[in-house]
């Protein structure tokens, strides 16, 4: 069990609800993942014939905590307004704060992100800020009152994994008491394992499952990956060595090498 913003959870995997081939694929993937927290975009647009009302009914049946996000917002004002709508709609003070500053890599706009964070925290929100792995930006968010940081592993939807391991490990070292969740860029279960081995508290992903050939099966794979990575970290992994070291103890010289003095 772990505590996320006052909620006791079993799963350290958070899952998005966008881009699935159908509602049925989405529901089964979420069930297979074992997640207890799903993200939902307030500005979500239905596509591929999916009915909006059917979507809401589907997610309500999943018995998960909702983490609404401000996807699509490009300044603090828009993000704050969206967060207020989300709080009223979902009856939650949780908000995944996204303020995008660039269309090419969907990198967060740091100045607007910090501005929105300060205002939302003052208004009683628990802010889950989508940010980069920049140490100074993360420190500013913590200074603004964030208890949770959600740095990217790579640009949203890229599937490139953890492109700057050093920066992510540095965040874990510098913020030992902050909840750290990798958000964006995860493409394979092995990426999730790596994030958890770094000591991150959780992983949030969407595209890697939604666009898989078999979303439900991929969700199962990520479920086990997150568990394996976390157990590896808590179990205490051996340190790397520059030279070989025998794994079998040599108590004495093998009998066939001993000199027969008889």
Curated annotation (Swiss-Prot):
InterPro entries the UniProt entry points to: Aldolase_TIM, Thiazole_synthase_ThiG, ThiG
Gene3D superfamilies: Aldolase class I (3.20.20.70)
Protein location: Cytoplasm
One annotated GO molecular function: thiazole synthase activity
Residues annotated to bind 1-deoxy-D-xylulose 5-phosphate: 157, 184-185, 206-207
Transferase among keywords: yes
Primary localisation category: cytoplasm
Stored Pfam families: ThiG
Pathway listed: Cofactor biosynthesis; thiamine diphosphate biosynthesis
Keyword Cytoplasm listed: yes
Active-site positions on this chain: 96
Keywords from the named record: Cytoplasm, Schiff base, Thiamine biosynthesis, Transferase
Enzyme Commission designation: 2.8.1.10
Subunit structure and binding partners: Homotetramer. Forms heterodimers with either ThiH or ThiS.
Protein family according to the UniProt entry: Belongs to the ThiG family.
Function: Catalyzes the rearrangement of 1-deoxy-D-xylulose 5-phosphate (DXP) to produce the thiazole phosphate moiety of thiamine. Sulfur is provided by the thiocarboxylate moiety of the carrier protein ThiS. In vitro, sulfur can be provided by H(2)S.
Protein name: Thiazole synthase
Natural source organism: Legionella pneumophila (strain Paris)
Gene: thiG
């Amino acid at each position: 069990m772990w505590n996320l913003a006052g909620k006791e959870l079993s799963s350290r995997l958070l899952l998005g609800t966008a881009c699935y081939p159908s509602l049925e694929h989405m529901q089964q993937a979420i069930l297979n993942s074992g997640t207890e927290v799903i993200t939902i975009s307030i500005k979500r647009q239905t596509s591929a014939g999916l009915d909006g009302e059917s979507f809401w009914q589907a997610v309500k049946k999943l018995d998960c905590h909702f983490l609404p996000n401000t996807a699509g917002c490009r300044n603090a004002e828009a993000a704050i307004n969206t967060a207020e709508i989300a709080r009223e709609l979902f009856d939650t003070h949780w908000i995944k704060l996204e303020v995008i500053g660039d269309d090419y890599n969907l990198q967060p706009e740091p100045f607007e992100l910090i501005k929105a964070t300060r205002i939302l925290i003052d208004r009683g929100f628990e802010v889950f800020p989508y940010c980069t792995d920049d140490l100074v930006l993360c420190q500013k968010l913590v200074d603004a009152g964030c208890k949770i940081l959600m740095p990217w592993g790579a640009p949203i939807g890229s599937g490139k994994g953890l492109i700057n391991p050093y920066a992510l490990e540095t965040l874990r070292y510098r913020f030992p008491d902050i909840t750290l969740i990798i958000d964006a860029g995860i493409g394979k279960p092995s990426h999730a394992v790596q994030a958890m081995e770094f000591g991150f508290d959780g992983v949030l992903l969407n595209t890697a499952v939604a666009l898989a050939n078999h979303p439900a099966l991929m969700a199962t794979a990520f479920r086990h990956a997150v568990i394996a990575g976390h157990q590896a970290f808590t179990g205490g992994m051996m340190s790397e060595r520059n030279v070989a070291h025998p794994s079998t103890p040599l108590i004495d010289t093998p009998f066939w090498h001993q000199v027969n003095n008889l």
